[in-house]
Amino acid sequence: MSTARTIRRFSTQPVDDVTLARCLEAATWAPSGANAQEWRFVVLKSPEQRAVVAEAAAQALKVIEVAYGMTRPAADDLSRRARDNRATYELHDRAGEFTSVLFAQKRLRMASDMLLAGSIFPAMQNLLLAARAQGLGACLTSWASYGGEQLLRTAVGVPDDWIIPGHIVVGWPKGRHGPVRRRPWQDAVNLDRWDERADDIASAAVVD
C-alpha cells in the first residue's frame, strides 16, 4: 500500500486480459452493503470507447485547470510541482490510448448516492491494490464527473437508475513505482473528540 501511488505516465504496452481479469476479480472481493453486490465494472478498451474517454478527459482538464490554477509548465521548470503537472497533462493528452474501467452502482430509493458509493469505493481500492501487486500502474480519475459523466453514461448505455461513482485508468507504468508522499498519519487521527490528538496511540505505534 505504501508504494501504490497514483501513476499518470504509462508505456505503450497494452494490458493483457489475464492481468486485467485478476484486477477485476479482486474488485469483487471488496465488501458491499448487505452483500448486495449491485455493482458493474465496465472495461473501456475499444477505439470508439477510448475516444469518448478522451473527450471526457478533455472536459475534466478544463475544470481542473481552473480549480487548481494549473497550467502547462515551461520546459525549463524542474520543480516538483512542474513534474507533477507534466504527468497530469500527459495523462489527459493520452487519455484515448489507455484501457480503463468505469464503476457503476445501482441506486436504491432509500439511500443517498454518497451512501451507495460506499458500496463500490472498496471495490475500486481493491482494483488499485491488485494492479499494484501485479506491477501495473493505475489512476483514479475525475473523468466520469463534470460533463464527462453524461458522455460516458450515454456511450456505455448506463441506465438512469445507476450512479457512476468512479473511473480508473490502468496500464504499465513508464518508470517505476515508488513510495507515496503523505503527511504523518498522526496529524489525521483524533481520539474521542475532534480537537483531541491521539498521542497515546501514536506513541504505541511500531516503527519499522
Residue ranges and their predicted role:
Residues M1, C23-A27, I168:
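Short alpha-helical scaffolding segments that buttress acidic/His motifs in well-ordered protein cores
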Residues M1-Q13:
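Generic N-terminal amphipathic, Lys/Arg-enriched alpha-helix
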Residues T6, I163-D208:
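C-terminal helix-cap and adjacent tail motif
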Residues D16:
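Conserved, non-catalytic sequence blocks in retroelement Pol enzymes and Pol-derived host proteins
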Residues R22-A27, L102-A155:
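Small-aliphatic-rich amphipathic alpha-helix that forms the alpha element of a beta-alpha
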Residues T28-A36:
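Glycine-rich phosphate/pyrophosphate-binding beta-alpha loops
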Residues Q37-S119:
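Glycine/small-residue-rich phosphate/adenosyl-binding loop
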Residues K62-P73, T154-R181:
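A glycine-rich helix N-cap at a beta->alpha junction
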